[in-house]
Amino acid sequence: MAIRRVMHVDLDAFFVSVEQSLRPELKSKPVIVGGKPERRGVVAAASYEARKFGIHSGMPLLSAKHLCPQAVFIEGNHRLYREYSEKFMQILSDFSPFLEPMGLDEAYLEVTGFESLHGSIGEMALKIRRRITAELSINASIGIANSKVVAKIATERAKPNGQCEVPAGEEAAFLAPLDISIMPGIGKKTEYHLKSLGINTLGRLAGIPATFLKIHLGTYAPYLLNAAAGIDNRPVEMPAEAKSISRETTFETDTRNHTFLEAKLGYLSEKIAATLRKRGKQARVVQIKIRFADFTTLTRQKHLNHPCSGNQEIFQTALKLMNGILDSDRRSVRLLGVGISDFCGPEKQLEIDPARARLEKLDASLDKIRQKYGFGSVQTGRTYKLKDLF
């Protein structure tokens, strides 16, 4: 029986690397993607040069500015990042059909038995990295091991722009000296709790009696014990199709401006509707989410009389839900979101409503233009108002 080999591929500082590939003058500089530091927001990605100042993803932009005043702050272009991600996944799929994407910038590959095609799995990893660099002008790091969890940790040890292979049978020895914080699934709270018990390394964690660990971590304990010993039998698999589509945005300042909220709701509705149509689906449920300035969050949903995928139908339903909340609540809004769910195939209509048919034709035309020139290339009168309100 062939020895199992799993590869974890991770693009280094992905958002920043994309920006640097298009703007060479940014290379070797501290670069932060996330927006302007004076705006309310967080760091989405930081270059390795910026990380030397203690900057990390999720940090408030203003804090990052204080740590590194000379950093270059970039708004970011998520449409561009998705395009790069699609090319990245296509490159990986050329090497193995057993591909499990994990977000835009990383994926697992099942590569057991692929030695005969590439000489060795290490050579295969090198080919992948070289092709990514050649075609995307960004670097990738790769970890190789007998399981997903060990391969991912190996990737962390390989960064940046390197590769690390853990030989079969040496997983426990590889993991033993490493700090528990490197283990996927151990967050800050669990790390603090384990270290308060004197458990600082994965080797120490692997040797803790299961009964003792279960008292402190509950049902999560068996997984952690196995993972710390390099045991992880999870398969590499394509993710199931998402059961919902949603978009939300946090505002720079809390607002009660209804014109602004309606325009933003229209924009979010058009984005999720376009994604739904791209999948060839319709939705039966529309939901909105509102978070107020005091962080209280309310959600409301509506089951539609018939499934739809149109911009106008989704927006009008979401608008009624939003107004139903705001008409009776005068608090300022911090976050607004809209979602759709309960998908089905296109509905067969015995009688076609002319008005609905015209809207469907309009949506299809918008989709074609936006796919070619970008979502902002054409706007409705409602969303165009956002330009005057930002």
Curated annotation (Swiss-Prot):
Catalytic reaction annotation: DNA(n) + a 2'-deoxyribonucleoside 5'-triphosphate = DNA(n+1) + diphosphate
Keywords: Cytoplasm, DNA damage, DNA repair, DNA replication, DNA-binding, DNA-directed DNA polymerase, Magnesium, Metal-binding, Mutator protein, Nucleotidyltransferase, Transferase
EC number(s) given by UniProt: 2.7.7.7
SUPFAM superfamilies linked: DNA/RNA polymerases (SSF56672), Lesion bypass DNA polymerase (Y-family), little finger domain (SSF100879)
GO cellular component: cytosol
GO molecular function, one term: magnesium ion binding
All residue ranges annotated as the UmuC domain in the record: 6-187
GO annotation, biological process: DNA-templated DNA replication; error-prone translesion synthesis; SOS response
Cofactor: Mg(2+)
Cofactor info, note text: Binds 2 magnesium ions per subunit.
Main enzyme class: transferase
Entry-linked InterPro entries: DNA/RNA_pol_sf (IPR043502), DNA_pol_Y-fam_lit_finger_sf (IPR036775), DNA_pol_Y-fam_little_finger (IPR017961), DNA_polymerase-Y (IPR050116), DNApol_IV (IPR022880), PolY_HhH_motif (IPR024728), Rev_trsase/Diguanyl_cyclase (IPR043128), UmuC (IPR001126)
Positions contributing to Mg(2+) binding: D10, D105
Active-site residues, record numbering mapped to chain: E106
Function: Poorly processive, error-prone DNA polymerase involved in untargeted mutagenesis. Copies undamaged DNA at stalled replication forks, which arise in vivo from mismatched or misaligned primer ends. These misaligned primers can be extended by PolIV. Exhibits no 3'-5' exonuclease (proofreading) activity. May be involved in translesional synthesis, in conjunction with the beta clamp from PolIII.
Family statement: Belongs to the DNA polymerase type-Y family.
Protein known as: DNA polymerase IV
Origin species: Dehalococcoides mccartyi (strain ATCC BAA-2266 / KCTC 15142 / 195) (Dehalococcoides ethenogenes (strain 195))
